[in-house]
């Protein structure tokens, strides 16, 4: 807010003069309706936006070209304040068309393909529209917009201010903004490359009545609002020639406005007719002569003012020519610099390309050497793997042979063990059968002996009982006789015989057992010898 105060203080006088001139013209023409001023003091400084708050209601093709242009991304990015953007407009803007001259190829295309609505092929977007979108990014206030449309240095600053209003403000407020400037006669060339000079008033009338602006479109105005604007414009016809006092007053106002905008002043001093008339009336006593003199002075004043206007126009033309020459020179310098830079860049690129090619060749050589070494290593590895596989095969064959021999040995041993087990089983069966037969014979013998002994014992007991019964008195004698009998040699002989028989029987049994054992040992000793012989014979055959 504080940065914009100097620009507004110097422009307050032209604003009030323009508003007063419009009111006087309406009263003289008979327009009874009172119009609203462009900006009232009661309104706030915050300026509301209408439509899309991100794209500023611009055509998408133009917006994408603005955002992708290096001028907007690099140079305008450094501008941060309102005054810096205004200075950039003063030095860079030469037309108000959206595209630069010759950048869009639309020859032979008609309708929508011709780019009438901005949907054709894009081109180089103009600096004017880049700066217009930069103003939109700054979010201008009401006072800043008024400073743009009443600026005194360049008509292109005013034109961009009016375009900002046309794109961002509601359609119902456009008449309030543009009404006091519809008769503004400041000239500007709006076409790229020149050839389309119009005044500020004519440009504003086209803004209000037409949607097309060269190869783009303004935001659409609703039908009732458009009808209202058309009716109000019909009541305000554009005045081409002005006669009498009204023309003089308009010329005076226009000259005052020019003087307030330009620092230079005209050579003829401004004098009011009342003061000249009063002075001449006091000097000369005759009123007719004073009136004639006053008329002559007024004619001279008008002539001088016309000459001053012509001089101002010539100065403007010379200034515009000088500006054009300066711009062309600066552009030619920039082109020369850009060409020299491009040449330097091309040389640097060539050197870089050569270095890159050399590095690539070195890398290729390294890769080739590495591939060769790698191939040699692979061949060595293959030979080693082949040798290892041969060794492993030979080892595997030897191990397989050993394994087969071990298996055969195990089979022979198992066969021998099985044969031994079978032989031992058969021998054990024979032994068991023999032992059973022997035990049976021994049992029979023992049974027969026990029967004999029992029968003998019974007989003896019977005899003893008979003897005891017979000789009860002769007990002692009988006992003595019995003792004698028992200790008689026949009795002892019989006992000795029985004992000798038992001993002989035991000896026979022991001898039989020893013979069986010896036979078993002989068979066991013979079997391993036979097995060893068989194994040797098999080994010899293998």
From Swiss-Prot:
It is found in: Nucleus. Its main location: nucleus. The modification N-acetylalanine is found at residue 2. Residues 1-24, 232-542 are annotated as: Disordered. Residues 13-24 have a biased composition (Low complexity). The modification N6-acetyllysine is found at residue 227. GO terms for cellular component: precatalytic spliceosome. It holds the Pfam family PRP38. May be required for pre-mRNA splicing. This is Pre-mRNA-splicing factor 38B. It comes from Rattus norvegicus. The gene is Prpf38b.
